[in-house]
Amino acid sequence: MATASQGKVTQVIGAVVDVQFDGGLPPILNALETENNGKRLVLEVAQHLGESTVRTIAMDATEGLVRGARVTDTGSPISVPVGDATLGRILNVIGEPIDEKGDLGEASTRAIHQPAPTFAEQSTTSEILVTGIKVIDLLAPYSKGGKIGLFGGAGVGKTVLIMELINNIAKVHSGYSVFAGVGERTREGNDLYHEMIESGVIKIDNLSESKVALVYGQMNEPPGARARVALTGLTLAEQFRDQSGTDVLFFVDNIFRFTQAGSEVSALLGRIPSAVGYQPTLATDMGALQERITSTKAGSITSVQAIYVPADDLTDPAPATSFAHLDATTVLSRAISELGIYPAVDPLDSTSRILDPQIVGEEHYNVARAVQGILQRYKSLQDIIAILGMDELSEEDKLSVARARKIQRFLSQPFDVAKVFTGSDGVQVPLEKTIASFKAVVNGEYDHLPEAAFYMVGDIEDVIAKAQRLAAQAA
């Protein structure tokens, strides 16, 4: 715009700020700027009230803001720096660096509100993204350019699994990653940053060689920031996809907080709540974000999203709305974590669209279904075992139970990022070895080995070595 229109603050209620303009009103989603305690405060237009007033959502704290303060219309939506200048850096929702490493320098900017790619631009090929984590690669494989949801209640290991995926894929992957911390713990964000420095994902001495950009809007931020920080992260990922033409990884921890912040904003704007108190625009908000995460002819964005499940209820509107957009779901189960099996992935609840013989091949598909079949048989026998004991089972069922218990333990795996908890080095297992190992267990080739040998190891060779160690200790 040639001349920036000026307005003034007329009302401040928490994160909602009303601004009066005597000239024309700025369009919905435009960014307005004012000064608060000597710092730039960005407001996003959410509603038009009458002929001269707009209702806006603040992207930072409004303490100290006064009525009558001057507000400037920037003439465009919130725009953030993108490209190589952001690598190795931590940005906030409006693209300001918050890692005390100085300015970003010359960087091109991009608006955080973008249309989703058109049908003509989208790519439709399916290819497996190997993570090195056995239970995921075998039973619910991730697709390149797909959307993956990590579902779980509080404290079952969503963030640890995301950190392991970043660790594994950054080591073997030449592409870029973007991590959006949406409404999660600042301490975890800090830990993640320092672990990335230690593992070499962020090169602190030469930031331009780093492989990841971080965008944080944590729990202590106002709802406006938490509702927009996922879009800021996605905008960075879109730029990397378009400029490099490679597979970009986009991690969101936690997508539920995006919905939660949207609910807070909706209530502040006076909208009538929908089911369970969520915003009436829940599906629209989620769709606007998720439809932008896709593969185009230029490259792809593979998204891994941690999804907190309130009270472990998968039918809650927030996780239920996320389900519709996902290609693969990794469900983390409290019952499995209580057995000490980590990652606590539920092998029967977790699903993947690409677990199809035409995509992963006949052998992989058949082994995965055989593993699930044995585990399902064990699950259906558990009531009988609890009431009558193992002795009442047929010989065939006893064998199924023994194999299922070995498979259950074999699906556990030590992680690099969890070394501080377990004391053992993490392992990444190639897909071919995962398939071959489970095929042998299903076929009964290792029925003679003890259950304990299958716990927290890599492939079948590690099981044999552990069994020999256990036998030597017992002797």
Curated annotation (Swiss-Prot):
Q: Which residues participate in ATP binding? A: G152, G153, A154, G155, V156, G157, K158, T159
User: Does the keyword Nucleus feature in the UniProt annotation?
Assistant: no
**PROSITE patterns annotated for this entry?**
ATPASE_ALPHA_BETA
Q: How does it sit in the membrane?
A: Peripheral membrane protein
Catalytic reactions on record:
ATP + H2O + 4 H(+)(in) = ADP + phosphate + 5 H(+)(out)
Q: Can you provide one Gene Ontology molecular function annotated for this UniProt record?
A: ATP hydrolysis activity
Gene Ontology CC: plasma membrane; proton-transporting ATP synthase complex
Tell me, in a sentence or two, what this protein's role is: Produces ATP from ADP in the presence of a proton gradient across the membrane. The catalytic sites are hosted primarily by the beta subunits.
- Please identify the protein, giving its name as recorded: ATP synthase subunit beta 1
What is the species of this protein?
Cereibacter sphaeroides (strain ATCC 17023 / DSM 158 / JCM 6121 / CCUG 31486 / LMG 2827 / NBRC 12203 / NCIMB 8253 / ATH 2.4.1.)
